[in-house]
Amino acid sequence: PELETEQSILDTIRQKDRFIHVPYHSFNSFIRVLREAALSADVKAINVTLYRLAKASKVVKALICAARNGKKVTVVIELLARFDEESNIKWSKRLQEAGVEVVFGVEGLKIHSKLVYIQCKSGDIACIGTGNLHEGNAKVYTDYMMMTARPQIVREVKKVFEFISKPFKPVKFRELLVSPNEMKPKILRLISDEIRNAKEGLEAWIKVKINHITDEDVVAKLYEASQAGVKISLLIRGNCS
C-alpha cells in the first residue's frame, strides 16, 4: 500500500529497499517504476531483460514511452522462451520500431533472468525478480521482486547487462549469483555448510521454493544432507527428479 501512495516511487526506493510479493502485493508497483522512469527528466537510460510478456503489455508500453521521451532504452529479449517465440518476435519488432535497442541474448545461453537497471542522475536503481514481467502471471504465480538503490547491488545488475552485450569480457560478481558459472557451485557449498552444521550438532535446515529442480548434483547433495540430519523442506511447482 505504501508504494501505491508515494508521489515518487523512485525516491521511495532510494530511501530503502522495497520488496513486493505477487500476487499478494500489486504488480502495479513495478509498472509505476517503469512509467515514472519513462517520464522523469532524472532518468537517462533503462535496461530490461524480458522473457514472457502479457498480450497488451504495460511493460512494453512504458519502455516505448521512455524511448520516445529520449531515454536510451535497451531490452534483452529471449526469442527461445518456450511457447512464446512468436510473441517475442512480434514484441521485438514493435520495440525496435519505437527506437528501443533490442538484444537477443548470448549465443549458447538462454537469458532467463528478470532484471531492470535504471540509470539516473540522482542515483541508479535496480529491480531483481523471480517472475516474468507479465501482468497476467503476476495475478496467479507467487513471485518476488526486490527494488533497490544499494550501489553494490545496482553495480552488479549493470554488470550483467554489460556481460550480455560483451560476453567475451570476463566478469566477476560478489553480490549476485549468476548462472551458469556461479550459481550451482554456490548452492552446493551452502548445502555442504548445512551438512557440516548437522554433523557438529548445530541447527541445520534448508528451505527451497523453486519452479523445477532437476540438476542431478544438487538433488544428490540434498539427499546427502537429509541423511546427515539436515531438516529439508522443498516447495516445487513443476519437475522434481
Report the location of each language-model feature:
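Histidine- and/or cysteine-centered catalytic micro-motif in compact active-site loops
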Residues: 211-213, 237-239
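Hydrophobic alpha/beta core scaffold segments
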Residues: 231-235
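Flexible, glycine/threonine-enriched loop-and-boundary segments that flank and lead into catalytic domains
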Residues: 99, 213-222
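N-terminal localization/anchoring segments of enzymes in phospholipid and broader phosphate metabolism
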Residues: 1-206, 224-228, 238-241
